[in-house]
Amino acid sequence: MVDKVPMTQNGFSKLQEELRWRQQEERPRIIEAIAEARAHGDLSENAEYHAAKEAQSHNEGRVSELEDLTARAEVIDLSKMSGSKIKFGATVKLIDEDTDEEKIYQIVGDQEADVKAGRISISSPIARAMIGKEAGDSIEVVAPGGSKAYEIIAVNWG
């Protein structure tokens, strides 16, 4: 059985766009760079050729990864999400119980997480601690930097 990869429509669209770019723009550019480097003669000491081949290997590896991710994607329509319990797609407002610092996070797929933008991976310690909880609940997050306690203030959708 193939594991589905949950993600938002926005995250899925970004993966599709990167895949299109790598296949239709980056791949031809690298092939051209390899051909140009080959034209310079001796390949054994041709740094341009080796750099282009390395770029090709990296690009093709990422293309394979993106094809796999998009094939296994489970796109979750956040406009149809609701309820008081926290699950994938929820935007959660928390207060750090030690510092009273307020944080707002949206729970998203692994590929679209960006902590600076307030998007955390569903598999992160804090998201795992929040799943199934509601506003008013307290959670304890055990992370590599130590343990932190938060109170959930609000759960929003969309």
From Swiss-Prot:
Superkingdom as given in the UniProt entry: Bacteria
PROSITE patterns per the UniProt record, alphabetical: GREAB_1 (PS00829), GREAB_2 (PS00830)
Xref: NCBIfam families: greA, PRK00226.1-2, PRK00226.1-4, PRK00226.1-5
Free-text function comment from the UniProt entry: Necessary for efficient RNA polymerase transcription elongation past template-encoded arresting sites. The arresting sites in DNA have the property of trapping a certain fraction of elongating RNA polymerases that pass through, resulting in locked ternary complexes. Cleavage of the nascent transcript by cleavage factors such as GreA or GreB allows the resumption of elongation from the new 3'terminus. GreA releases sequences of 2 to 3 nucleotides.
Record has Transcription regulation as a keyword: yes
Protein name per the record: Transcription elongation factor GreA
HAMAP family: GreA_GreB
GO annotation (BP), single: DNA-templated transcription elongation
Transmembrane regions listed in the UniProt entry: none
InterPro entries, sorted: GreA/GreB_C_sf (IPR036953), TF_GreA/GreB_CS (IPR018151), Tscrpt_elong_fac_GreA (IPR006359), Tscrpt_elong_fac_GreA/B (IPR028624), Tscrpt_elong_fac_GreA/B_C (IPR001437), Tscrpt_elong_fac_GreA/B_fam (IPR023459), Tscrpt_elong_fac_GreA/B_N (IPR022691), Tscrpt_elong_fac_GreA/B_N_sf (IPR036805)
UniProt organism field: Allorhizobium ampelinum (strain ATCC BAA-846 / DSM 112012 / S4)
Metal-binding recorded as keyword: no
Keywords annotated in UniProt: DNA-binding, Transcription, Transcription regulation
Molecular-function annotations in GO: DNA binding; RNA polymerase binding
Pfam family, one: GreA_GreB_N
Family: Belongs to the GreA/GreB family.
